[in-house]
C-alpha cells in the first residue's frame, strides 16, 4: 500500500510516498531555487515505551505555550476531476497545473498575511521583534517531554507554574511531595558536631593528661563542730609539679630548751608528739608580751617577735601567728594540718576551717600560766582521743614534706621560733 502526502512548507512542495511493505519512504522535494530532488530512506519502526515513562508525550504543549492569534484556515483540497457527459471527457493536464498553481499562490498569500498580523500584534503589545514563535515552543516542549521520558520509573515530574517538583512513585497512583530538610536542622547538626569536637579535645588536653593528675586524693575536712568530731586524714602528701598545685605554706618549727619540735609531730631527739603543746606555749608567751621570743627566717634573718618594727618583720609575725594557730586547731581535733592547707581556698563542699589567732587557740588550755620562764607542758589532751579515727598516725606524719627545712627562698618566711 502506497500513501502519498503533499505538504507546503515555506513555499516548497514536497511529495512523500511511503510503502508499508518494506518501510521505504520516497520523497520528491522542490527546493526554493526550483531544483527538484528525490530522497529515499527507510523509516525506523516505532517501539512502545516501557515503564511509567510511557505516560509522557514527547510533543505535549502546555497551555501557557499557546501563541494567541487567528485560527489557521483549513487548506483547500486538491481539485477533483470533473467528468462531463456521464464520465466522458476530463480536463486536460494544462488546466490541472493552472489550478494547482492558483491554489499554491492563494496559500502563500494567506501565510504572509498571518505573519504580518502576528508582527503587528507583537508591536502593539510592546513586545520585542523576533520573539519565539509557536514552532520554537513546540520544539522546547518536545525537549521537555523527552527529558521527562528519560526520568527513572520511581520519579515523575509535574510542572506547576514556573517550578518543577518531584514526587515519589507510590503504588496507589498518588504521589506525595518530598519535603526538604529544614536549614535550622543542618545548622544545629554542625554546631553540635563542633561542640563535641572541642569537648573531645579538652578531654584529651586536661582529663587524660598525666601532668594534671594530682598525687593525693583529697579527703574533705568537714566543718568544725562543737562536739569535737574528728577530721579525715589525707591519703598522700605529695604535690605534682604543675601550676595548679597550691604550694604549702611553711609552718615554723618551735625550739624550746634546745629541743626542736617539728610540724610533723616529731622532735630533734627522735621523740613523737609535742608540737601542739609547743605551739600553744609560743602563743601564751606571745600574748603575754614576753621578750624572749626570737624568729629565724629562711634568709638567715633573726629578729625579736614581740618587738618587730619593720614592715617585713610585722608581715612575718602575722604569717607565723596565722599558721601556728591553724596548725594547733587542726591537731587539736585529731586531723593532720596538711588537710587545712590542701583545702584552703577550696569550695564549701569540702568544708572550711576558720582562720584562728592565738587568742582562739588559747581557749583549748585556759590553765596555761603567763610566766615567760615557765617550762613546757607536753601533756595536752583534746576531746575524743579514743576511737576508730582518734589519735595521730605517726607513720603517715613522717613522710610529710613539711619536715624539710630547705624551703625555697623566693619568699621570706619564718622557719624557727626560738624560746630563749
From Swiss-Prot:
Membrane spanning stretches: 185-205
Intravirion side, ranges: 1-184
Highest rank taxon of the organism: Viruses
Mode of membrane association: Single-pass type II membrane protein
Disordered, as annotated region: 1-21, 64-129
Similarity comment: Belongs to the herpesviridae BDLF2 family.
Protein name, UniProt field: Protein BDLF2
Organism: Epstein-Barr virus (strain B95-8)
Amino acid at each position: 500500500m502506497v500513501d502519498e502526502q503533499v505538504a507546503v512548507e515555506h513555499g516548497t512542495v514536497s511529495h512523500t510516498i511511503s510503502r508499508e511493505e518494506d518501510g521505504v519512504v520516497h520523497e520528491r522535494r522542490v527546493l526554493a531555487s526550483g531544483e527538484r530532488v528525490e530522497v529515499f530512506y527507510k523509516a525506523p519502526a516505532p517501539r512502545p515505551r516501557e515503564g511509567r515513562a510511557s505516560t509522557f508525550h514527547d510533543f505535549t504543549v502546555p497551555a501557557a505555550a499557546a501563541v494567541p492569534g487567528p485560527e489557521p484556515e483549513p487548506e483547500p483540497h486538491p481539485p477533483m476531476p470533473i467528468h462531463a457527459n456521464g464520465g466522458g471527457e476530463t480536463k486536460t493536464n494544462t488546466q490541472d497545473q493552472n489550478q494547482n498553481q492558483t491554489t499554491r499562490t492563494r496559500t502563500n498569500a494567506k501565510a504572509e498575511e498571518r505573519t504580518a498580523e502576528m508582527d503587528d500584534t507583537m508591536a502593539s503589545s510592546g513586545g520585542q521583534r523576533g520573539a519565539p514563535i509557536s514552532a520554537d515552543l513546540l520544539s522546547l516542549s518536545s525537549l521537555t517531554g523527552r527529558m521527562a521520558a528519560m526520568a527513572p520509573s520511581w520519579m515523575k515530574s509535574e510542572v506547576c507554574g514556573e517550578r518543577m517538583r518531584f514526587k515519589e512513585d507510590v503504588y496507589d497512583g498518588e504521589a506525595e511531595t518530598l519535603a526538604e530538610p529544614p536549614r535550622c536542622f543542618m545548622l544545629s547538626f554542625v554546631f553540635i558536631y563542633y561542640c563535641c569536637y572541642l569537648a573531645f579535645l579538652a578531654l584529651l588536653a586536661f582529663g587524660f593528661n598525666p601532668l594534671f593528675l594530682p598525687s593525693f586524693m583529697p579527703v574533705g575536712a568537714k566543718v568544725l563542730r562543737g562536739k569535737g568530731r574528728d577530721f579525715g586524714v589525707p591519703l598522700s602528701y605529695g604535690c605534682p609539679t604543675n601550676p595548679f598545685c597550691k604550694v604549702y605554706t611553711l609552718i615554723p618549727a618551735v625550739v624550746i630548751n634546745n629541743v626542736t619540735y617539728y610540724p610533723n609531730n616529731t622532735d630533734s631527739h627522735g621523740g613523737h608528739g609535742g608540737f601542739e603543746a609547743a605551739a600553744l606555749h609560743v602563743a601564751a608567751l606571745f600574748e603575754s608580751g614576753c621578750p624572749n621570743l626570737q624568729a629565724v627566717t629562711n634568709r638567715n634573718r633573726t629578729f625579736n617577735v614581740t618587738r618587730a618594727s619593720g614592715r617585713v618583720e610585722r608581715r612575718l609575725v602575722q604569717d607565723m601567728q596565722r599558721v601556728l594557730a591553724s596548725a594547733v586547731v587542726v591537731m587539736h581535733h585529731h586531723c593532720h594540718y596538711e588537710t587545712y592547707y590542701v583545702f584552703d581556698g577550696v569550695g564549701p563542699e569540702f568544708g572550711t576551717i576558720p582562720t584562728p589567732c592565738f587568742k582562739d587557740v588559747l581557749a583549748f588550755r585556759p590553765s596555761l600560766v603567763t610566766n615567760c620562764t615557765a617550762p613546757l607542758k607536753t601533756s595536752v589532751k583534746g576531746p575524743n582521743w579514743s576511737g576508730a579515727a582518734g589519735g595521730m598516725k605517726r607513720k603517715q606524719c613522717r613522710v610529710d614534706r613539711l619536715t624539710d627545712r630547705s624551703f625555697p627562698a623566693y619568699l621570706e618566711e619564718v622557719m624557727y621560733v626560738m624560746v630563749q
